[in-house]
Regions:
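Generic structural signal for well-ordered, non-membrane alpha-helices
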Residues: 3, 23, 41, 104, ...
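Short His/Asp/Glu-rich catalytic/ion-coordination signatures at enzyme active sites or charged loops
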Residues: 30, 55, 193
Length: 350
């Protein structure tokens, strides 16, 4: 697992590896060792990419172990204040929108970098899709599927949701947005060890989307969280809900109407060159990253990165809490992208 761990690749420190972290878990749980700051740092620096799970021949459930450990840590030690504030915002969609607008003004004035509180590259200034409500349903038809819009994605990257709805509508599929009724999926709360908060979000989502329709997700982290509600909530209803959650690529590949749409545009504008970068939670958690390739291959020439799916370092809130490690992982990923496109004059990164 060591070559697949971004923090071990950066630090070379065994304590910053999956194997080392599991050893530290055992030292406290089985041997009664007292946690010190180095012990806490080992878990704080884990990005949670789960690349180690994919590489592990023994199928050690590292994701479950790290979440359980962080939950135990949180019961003894509160997470950083700025993380708690950020996670609280995710529970209030309107407040998140207004807060993002305020931060966007600070960003536009060039003041955000001076504060050192948030990375300047976060797209606070992204505009919402025009008239997103008009895209909810096609011509008054009952929606066949629900698009999970979440919290941050809906505020900072609404164009992704709009593009998904455009594609599905073009294929003749009516779509309904989950909107604020469902809200946040709770993934970041669970990763932070705030299990009770994660459960509250999961209960809200499952209650809002309980009518049996497929739930499509265009964010890998959200999709992974929704697919794990059965484990998190431990109920029959939660397992039923998770069984009808699909990553958007996964669902589109299996839908004949989308396949027909793809076939209709094949060759119309030539074959673009696309470099594929897998989100960790699509590749290592949901394990449905091949569906991206299956969807694109008929209409594009694909280039694979040479890093075997190594994490980009973003990790949700990780880039805010561990900026140096996140930047080092990002630099490695950017170098891999540059190697992939060095001989191409025009490419798209997907």
């Amino acid at each position: 697992c060591l070559p697949h761990c971004p923090t071990y690749r950066v630090t070379g420190d065994e304590r910053r590896s999956p194997r080392g972290r599991i050893a530290l878990m055992r030292a406290v749980e089985r041997d009664g060792a007292a946690p010190d700051q180095d012990w806490y740092d080992a878990f704080d620096t884990c990005v949670g990419c789960l690349g180690c799970e994919t590489a592990c021949p023994s199928a050690v459930p590292y994701g479950y172990l790290i979440n359980a450990t962080r939950s135990a840590i949180t019961s003894e030690r509160r997470p950083p204040f700025k993380l708690l504030v950020g996670l609280r915002l995710l529970s209030w969609p309107r407040l998140l929108r207004w807060g993002s607008k305020a931060i966007a003004v600070v960003q536009r004035l060039g003041l955000l970098r001076r504060t050192g509180l948030l990375p300047d590259r976060i797209p606070f200034r992204s505009q919402r899709a025009k008239n997103p409500g008009s895209r909810n349903l096609r011509s008054g038809e009952p929606a066949e599927v629900v698009l999970f819009t979440g919290c941050v994605m809906d505020v900072w990257q609404p164009s992704v949701h709009a593009a998904v709805i455009d594609v599905l509508n073009a294929a003749g599929i009516a779509v309904e947005r989950s909107g604020d009724a469902a809200g946040c999926c709770g993934a970041l709360h669970e990763h932070a060890g705030l299990t009770d908060d994660a459960v509250s979000h999961a209960l809200r989502v499952t209650a809002a989307l309980s009518d049996g329709r497929p739930v499509l997700v265009d964010s890998a982290g959200c999709g992974a969280a929704l697919k794990h509600y059965g484990r998190l909530l431990g109920s029959k209803a939660a397992n039923e809900f998770s069984s009808r959650v699909y990553d958007i690529h996964e669902w589109c590949v299996d839908d004949s109407r989308v396949s027909s749409l793809v076939a209709s545009v094949e060759g119309r504008t030539g074959r673009p060159i696309v470099v594929v970068q897998d989100p960790c939670h699509l590749r290592h958690d949901q394990k449905c990253h091949d569906s991206v390739r299956d969807l694109l291959r008929p209409i594009a020439d694909l280039i694979e990165l040479d890093d075997e799916g190594l994490c980009c370092g973003a990790g949700g809130a990780y880039q805010l809490l561990q900026p140096d490690l996140a930047q080092a992982a990002r630099d490695r990923k950017v170098a891999s992208v540059h190697r992939a496109i060095r001989s191409e004059s025009s490419v798209t990164l997907a």
